[in-house]
């Protein structure tokens, strides 16, 4: 037996939090009375008793024969080549707002009937494949709701029906500014089984209306009311309420904004703070954490902070083999965080609903794991970071980025992440009234 390379021990008040990056298991022990014993068990695993059994079960101690890097590589390949197919579709690149930080160019025009037919043929092809058991369609843009009736509704309805016919699980979701989500459209969203939304606000009402307006017409109240309507009329909906922030926005009274959402729907809303990318060089972790805590204390769904994750073996959904991002003109991309210039094109959709991929790009993407480089393989954070996404690593290799390591730009350090993960696990166990191990205290 040997100690895992991915054990972390973080002092917290009068205790030490013990965390393993591969298993995601976390517990705490008394700093004064128990930690030295636990550490000795882990560092020199001799004999068999209840303590060593617990540590082995939770991967703090592993078999001599276990290669943790191979375990991570194997699970990375499994997650990238799994049996779900994810389509991200842009009905348009038009938008009813003009946010100053948006990286997209508002090209006029919507998806044509011809391209819609190609997409329906693609969906037929995907759902008839024996190895595909789930289809996920994410609507993106531009503002996708500009062409809800013309594009989103008919394609989603088609996909829902053909998935039911072929016994394929179907999910659809949308990233939207939320302004056009009328009561009538919410009813139509129920019909196509859309239950997940990402909707953005920019700080408080005053700041938001300066950034997000329709030719000067304020949008804040309309968006908040639409979010409340979605939670009211679509049972079990899940909303990611993205708050784009700068240091100035973090200092606002975010609680006043969040209090606009009734208590009974807050469990369906996860508040996700994301820094405006033009201010990525700035830092204010203290205010960021204060606001994350505030959202949690107000009853919103739990959210982890930082760029780290548990049991996620690839960085981005776009790194998966069964993924395609289809623009309104039928051209195919991978990354949803870049523009739609020729440089980022990865293929094109044929009349028969087949994606003609750029084979060179696919070979580069899938020949090995993105973290299969010296820096990542030697890093203790690998299981909870899983390296760069393909696009960031490509930009770095082509000299268009100075770094590919997320840790170098992470506003929340790893110790803080682990402490907060531990506290989140405790809170969830209490809310579910699970039997809580004394080790969580």
What are these regions (language model features)?
Residues 102-114, 339-342, 382-418:
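Iron-sulfur (Fe-S) cluster-binding segments and ferredoxin-like electron-carrier domains
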Residues 3-28, 49-88, 441:
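N-terminal [4Fe-4S]-dependent radical SAM core
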Residues 88, 92, 105-272:
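Conserved glycine-rich "GG(E/T)P / GGGxP" loop and the immediately following alpha-helix
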Residues 13, 317-321:
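Short, small/polar residue-rich loop motifs at catalytic or cofactor-binding pockets
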Residues 94-104, 334, 372-391:
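Local cysteine-cluster metal-coordination motifs and their immediate loop/turn environment
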Residues 26, 331-332:
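Hydrophobic "anchor" residues
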Residues 122-142, 402-441:
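Short Fe-S-cluster ligation motifs
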Residues 284-311, 337-386:
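C-terminal accessory region of radical SAM enzymes
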